[in-house]
């Protein structure tokens, strides 16, 4: 997936056949170090072992990730589509992961055969798919975090939103991701140089560096700062609610918050090393041996696919949390099997019940189902002593 210029003699990016041609590092025709790279040097035992290992690992990730994300899509659409708000975002996350994992067969084929079989269209589509799904994932996570924030601190605002606004937000995340991906889809092309073929962008090194820096800002830095700010304010709100006089039992929404944060942290853990590796080669030519550079490239590539492979497990926990919460609401108070009162659904309610202190003490429940139960009726006046029968 990556786009790091690297010494062609060590790891020629996107090379299909033939030997590499020496070029100045960082020059306009610098090769691209990526998951679409294929070593064109004569095969040795070490190369065969590395190719077999990376091919096996990526294939296993692809199988597990595709099955897991497909399962997530089926379960989410069947179980939560009609009742929970989160299903729109979980479906979008699973779809982005699924599309990203479907590129693995093309990578493995390039590694094993040491040839690029997919032509100019393959260069544009596969590179574009990488960046499209990456941005769609992080933008969706940002929207999820923003909605969790609003559900906790601004519950009265969320109930006034139209019913289908989440679908519009999901569509907007994909359109924005496509807009950021279009430059690389239009600029990437298949170039033949003697006996080898390379996928190279049509722009020069400065434009290439500027574009990669922009992608880092839009996929890691910008969303990271925004999500960090939202969760910092949520943490402060939780601390204040714990100090309140009337403490409330922890609701399932708090667990949903932790799961969303876990998905975000997993994304950063898998993609931050990848992007640091890309930018390092753009702004500083690290004196790495070819073998070391190849290992780093393999590891960062596997990390990005590992994210899409591991996400379905968190998605399953998130959807299960919502299913349990919805079942608890249907049972109503006092039927939680000894686990304490469970918040029940009031059909004609419009607002979420708060603790009476502030909106920040409200429980972070899904906004479409966390409707506020009507106020408790006034306590009747105490009756006088009854006359003896």
UniProtKB/Swiss-Prot annotation:
GO terms for cellular component: membrane; plasma membrane. Residues 1-54, 114-124, 187-209, 285-297 are extracellular. Pfam families: 7tm_1. Disulfide bonds join 123-199. Residues 1-10, 30-39, 355-368 have a biased composition (Polar residues). It is a multi-pass membrane protein. Residues 1-39, 328-389 are annotated as: Disordered. Keywords: Cell membrane, Disulfide bond, G-protein coupled receptor, Glycoprotein, Membrane, Receptor, Transducer, Transmembrane, Transmembrane helix. Gene3D superfamilies: Rhodopsin 7-helix transmembrane proteins (1.20.1070.10). Glycans are attached at residues 29, 33. Most abundant expression in the heart and pancreas. It comes from the Eukaryota. Residues 377-389 have a biased composition (Pro residues). It is found in: Cell membrane. PROSITE patterns: G_PROTEIN_RECEP_F1_1, G_PROTEIN_RECEP_F1_2. GO terms for biological process: blood circulation; blood vessel diameter maintenance; neuropeptide signaling pathway; regulation of blood pressure; signal transduction. Residues 78-87, 147-167, 233-258, 319-389 are cytoplasmic. High affinity receptor for urotensin-2 and urotensin-2B. The activity of this receptor is mediated by a G-protein that activate a phosphatidylinositol-calcium second messenger system. Belongs to the G-protein coupled receptor 1 family. PANTHER family: G-PROTEIN COUPLED RECEPTOR, UROTENSIN-2 RECEPTOR. This is Urotensin-2 receptor. The gene is UTS2R.
